[in-house]
Swiss-Prot record:
Every SF4 helicase domain range: 196-462, 341-604
Matching Gene3D superfamilies: DNAb Helicase, Chain A, Hedgehog/Intein (Hint) domain, P-loop containing nucleotide triphosphate hydrolases
Gene from which the chain derives: dnaB
Cellular component GO terms held in the UniProt record: cytosol; primosome complex
Record-linked InterPro entries: DNA_heli_DnaB-like_N_sf (IPR036185), DNA_helicase_DnaB (IPR007692), DNA_helicase_DnaB-like_C (IPR007694), DNA_helicase_DnaB-like_N (IPR007693), DNA_helicase_N/primase_C (IPR016136), Hint_dom_N (IPR003587), Hint_dom_sf (IPR036844), P-loop_NTPase (IPR027417)
GO biological process: DNA replication, synthesis of primer
Record note on quaternary structure: Homohexamer.
Region annotated Disordered, chain positions: 1-25
Keywords: ATP-binding, DNA replication, DNA-binding, Helicase, Hydrolase, Isomerase, Nucleotide-binding, Primosome, Repeat
Catalytic activity: Couples ATP hydrolysis with the unwinding of duplex DNA at the replication fork by translocating in the 5'-3' direction. This creates two antiparallel DNA single strands (ssDNA). The leading ssDNA polymer is the template for DNA polymerase III holoenzyme which synthesizes a continuous strand; ATP + H2O = ADP + phosphate + H(+)
One Pfam family matching this protein: DnaB_C
Protein name, per record: Replicative DNA helicase DnaB
Amino acid sequence: MAVVDDLAHSGMDAVPPSEDFGRQPPQDLAAEQSVLGGMLLSKDAIADVLERLRSGDFYRPAHQNVYDAILDLYGRGEPADAVTVAAELDRRGLLRRIGGAPYLHTLISTVPTAANAGYYAGIVAEKALLRRLVEAGTRVVQYGYAGAEGADVAEVVDRAQAEIYDVAECRLSENYVPLEDLLQPTMDDLDAIASNGGISRGAPTGFTELDEVTNGLHPGQMIIVAARPGVGKALALDTPLPTPTGWTAMGDVAVGDELLAVDEAPTRVVAATEVMLGRPCYEIEFSDGTVIVADAQHQWPTSYGIRTSAQLRCGLDIIAAAGSTPRHAGRLTTAAFMAPVLCIDSVRRVRSVPVRCVEVDNAAHLYLAGRGMVPTHNSTLGLDFMRSCSIKHRLASVIFSLEMSKSEIVMRLLSAEAKIKLADMRSGRMTDDDWTRLARRMSEISEAPLYIDDSPNLTMMEIRAKARRLRQKTNLKLVVVDYLQLMTSGKRFESRQVEVSEFSRHLKLLAKELELPVVAISQLNRSPEQRTDKKPMLSDLRESGSLEQDADVVILLHRPDAFDRDDPRGGEADLILAKHRNGPTKTVTVAHQLHLSRFTNMAR
């Protein structure tokens, strides 16, 4: 039996279709011959068939080879008849394998008329769909046996569901629609926009000025929200970093090494920069005597929110430290207890030194640095869109978070909605007023149709399958993927850029298929930091130019005070609408309240 699709998945071996059921797989060889015969007779038949069939839809491998040769000739603008197709197959060394040139003439003689090629193609497509269903069922059975033998049951169920969804996805349909059939739905959309205050049926972002420009996030759109990663920034090369077995230095750590997360659990380094020279640096001394040299943009989680090195204030900013840390440089233990917070004793500008940064894979993106075990941090914008969509407007949304855990996301949502400092929530310093505000908001928050999936190492296929399933259950209106550069395909690509391009293409296809906006959180490269004007540009999108090409909307996040603590626009952030396929570009200014885990509209 021919294997039509290679549906191997990461983490679980592909299961070949079984031929042990004693039945002939669904097929119609006469219909296959009639399709190919019609294509050899008529160019119009080729155009009709290629919209309905893929090569793998043919049961006989010989028919697959003939079909591929016909399409290649047709695509090159060359005639596709018995003579030219025979020559093409001979060039590929496949002519004898399909039965030689006489078989091509047999195909022509079996078809009564080329005009019916499209009808025959429908028969072939139906049989192919049934074969895929049989093959998927065989794999599902084998997955069930794998679960009985100790494989993760949740993963087995997810793979089984994905198999069935993949079968349904293979069905082809005519996507062109006559204009007259589109006029009334378009008029209905216009009426809905007018009655909704100018906002289309898309999901509102929650930012008034941005919604005025975009009319919300529209079905079928892929929206890229990109910012510089705040994780790690840059520390001096001699900065000590605790590891599960001792200590290393920032200059020595490599991708794949393990550091310690803020809870002192091992966390793996997934990215590391080259050594950077000439960056403005600060020496920060903490209340326990720890001294760390970091570049001006290094971010620290303080009691007042995220602050860069240049923004830290002596005697005012407090940084939470690890709960229990060693006081010596030997093997790490939990014997010595450290005060739960560290005060900033001094911050002073020092001469520039070589610096470097790393990125870690734990959910909070925190790792410990220095003998005092001081954590560093990162944050994103996507949750603001979800809060507007689900909490304010009661539209279903889902976030696939490869960066933060469920608990971290919920804590940020509560912080933003109840206006409670995230640092106070994490450290147990909430006041009675904080608890009262939280209680008032809990009812509305708990009723929001907002879904969170923090499954590690999510593949694009899994995201698509889960989004489809949720769409059927909840009338899903918004998908957020956080973030793009943490996605994995489970396949081999010639470069990471090619892999990210593939993710980009599939996210756009997902938006069109489910008819909803898909927001992909992405990263910018470090180019803005090297320019006098720090504002990011489209060319700064990290790892793939395809992101810019595939996206309908690209929003670049820029905070002026992240680069200069004395910037007159302190507390402001720019949402740079750098690409807007269906409208104008614009820069929208919002207020950042990072201590409350949110951005908000500027006061008017």
